[in-house]
Amino acid sequence: MPASAPQNSTTFDSARFLDDYKKTADALGAPYNESIVARTLNSFGNCFNEGTVIWRSTSRPNDKLNYRFYLRDRVDTVALAIKAGYIEESHPMARLVTCWSNLFDGETVQWCDLDPEEGVAKTWIFMKTQRSIDNILDAAEVSDCVRAHRATFHSLGLKLVHFAAVDYHGGTLNIYFTVPGPISEAQAAAYTNLSGCKPPTPDEFADLRKYLPTQRFVFAATIDYTTGKIKRVAFYALNVPGSELPETMNDRLRKFFADAPSYDKQQTKNIAWSYGNGDSKYMKGLGEECEESRAGTFGPDVGGCESFLLLLRL
């Protein structure tokens, strides 16, 4: 069932999801463990039923097909992951997530990125509104080597944060900035330089100018928690309409958008260009599996769930 043929139901169905997952992963040549995928659907209470469920794929051959849920209400998903045995309570990334989640009088929401072989890949922290990068870096569990980027972030205009995330298996943290647009070539080059990567090619920059919002856009940095090294950065194009896709997108990611089922009445696509150490580059795509997104779901600063079906795997 192609993504262009939405069905009537926007309610999550675990049996349907598992069947759709296997078909989509097989079509993409993405590895998975069916029993682990099935177990994750039962490990997080009503999170799949109450949230928006997202597919996530990349342009890299044989890369995994991950899946996510975005929630409206506060749920301790870290505790659920620990209870299920996916992570240890003492894991530095688990402590960091809990620390960030307790900022701003607990006015945050945790989201999860699930891995078809490991169980849990990442936990996201949605800040509900834009927060100062200083608040994020000053959190008790943030390592000093990560805080060392403070002046650099400020000098590049990377001052406001709407989301953060941790990667349990990669040992990295992600910070998602909201920055003014429209993007310029100098701005793009300065941002990719953070990860030691060359500037976007002319074709890539043409796509960035075409698809990134002109008023403001999402830019993310992936940082090693132990060393402080910025390993990767990414630019996000949100709510790409209809069948339109960037010229620089390869066949694998195009197939993902064509084949991944969606049961949402209003389908949206979210696309990221990722630039990493050693000039490693790839693209990411996210699409909704179910639950109709509505503007204002997460507040006016975000503009609805669709504004960050992103993010963002950084």
Swiss-Prot record:
Residues passing through the membrane, by range: none
Any Pfam family hit: PTase_Orf2
UniProtKB keywords: Prenyltransferase, Transferase
An example Gene Ontology molecular-function term: prenyltransferase activity
InterPro entries to which the protein is assigned, alphabetical: Aro_prenylTrfase, Prenyltransferase_CloQ, PrenylTrfase-like_sf
Enzyme Commission designation: 2.5.1.-
Domain of life: Eukaryota
Enzyme class name: transferase
Keyword tRNA-binding in record: no
Keyword Transferase set for record: yes
Reported function: Prenyltransferase that attaches isoprenoid moieties to carbon atoms of aromatic substrates in an enzyme-catalyzed Friedel-Crafts reaction.
Additional notes on this entry: The gene is not located within a recognizable secondary metabolic gene cluster.
Protein family per UniProt: Belongs to the aromatic prenyltransferase family.
Protein name: Aromatic prenyltransferase
Gene of this entry: ptf
